[in-house]
Amino acid sequence: MKLFGTDGIRGIVNEFLTPEIAFRLGNVLGNMVDKKIFIAKDTRASGDMLEEALVAGITSAGVDAYKCGVLTTPALALITRLENAAGVMISASHNPPEYNGLKVLMRGYKLPDDIEERIEREMEKIRYCEYKSVGKVIEYDFASEEYFEYIKKQYSFLDLSGIKLVVDVANGATYKLNPQILEYFGAKLEVVNDRPDGFNINRDCGSTHPENVKKNITGSKIAVLYDGDGDRCIFVDEKGEEFHGDKILGITAIDLKKENRLKKNNVVLTILSNMGLEEFLKNNEINVVRTKVGDRYILEEMLKNDYTLGGERSGHIIYRDKSTTGDGLITTLEVLSSLVKSGLTLHDLSNRIPDYPQVMVNVEVKNKEIYKNKKVFSLMKSIKDYRVIIRPSGTEPVIRVLVEGPDLEKITDIANKFYELIKELDKE
């Protein structure tokens, strides 16, 4: 059975993702690494169950399990980098609470495909250590503090006094730490969705549901919204308009270039980033490279060519001189730093970057390979002067259709045609 998707192992708990899978993963990792493995989780009720299974698997292979408790993915990535160790993040990111996931990190980085394939093969067998070598379980209470200290050093110059910020922590992993750090830098906060109960993570809140925050933006307030594991964010400006990943990349790329932080004068985007962003960057003499969808592919391109900045429209942004992975908090601080330096409003900054209309439809299907049908290709060939991207979701039974172009009515009509065609083909 195929376990690893685009972002680790992820699925509905006790239907696809079971304690047995967590145990087997822990056992394989314990047999692959030396000494210790760090474990963190978001606020889902199923996190405790999966954590205990992971711990059992790790220690059964003779390796110590360090439990970090509730922590963001980027904070765990930092710990594994500082400790030169492996880690497992228990989270399904932006997915609803019935989902959970297991994301493996090695010295700060997500695993390449070939290592995941090797792990998947090894999970078919279990190898126990001798009873004298069973690993220990260690409560590692310093992870949040280590991350906090790292951020303070990286942004020691930053003064956010005067910034009024609504912070939507999605009832997820950011609910304590991110507000504490933003307050440390002087921002005046209104924190919402910060009462996790195990079942409300991402529920009508956070980066995938900005509608409620948009309604409540007044005066000079702006908002930042995180996802369940804190590796991405989006903003809402003073006018209640969304300031998404493309806008973040455009604005911060200009500042990175001024500060000589933008290596090789290049930004890495995915195929989903708007053509308006690409035009804006090129007009500012910044080059663009595009990859497949997924922050892992962005990072691979960045590492291969030594680029500093890359990201996705969804808010996964990697500042490689600060972090080895997408980090919602670092993204927040970079945007707010640009905002303070500019003396403008976030809305004014946003308006600098053109944004062609995009329509995305999610088509629920039984067969995710249906998008390869000849009739779908035929319809794509018939579309002129508009960009169409069709791809299966890596985590859900969904095919995503993105249409981009200057005319909203036209792209909506095109998107609906693809929706109807794929639905019809899926019935056959």
Swiss-Prot record:
Q: Which reaction does it catalyse?
A: alpha-D-glucosamine 1-phosphate = D-glucosamine 6-phosphate
Tell me the residue numbers annotated for binding Mg(2+).
Answer: S93, D227, D229, D231
Q: Which cofactor does it need?
A: Mg(2+)
Residues with the modification Phosphoserine, per the entry, are: S93
Name its GO BP terms in alphabetical order: carbohydrate metabolic process; peptidoglycan biosynthetic process; UDP-N-acetylglucosamine biosynthetic process
What's this chain's function?
Catalyzes the conversion of glucosamine-6-phosphate to glucosamine-1-phosphate.
Q: What protein am I looking at? A: Phosphoglucosamine mutase
Q: Which organism is it from?
A: Thermosipho melanesiensis (strain DSM 12029 / CIP 104789 / BI429)
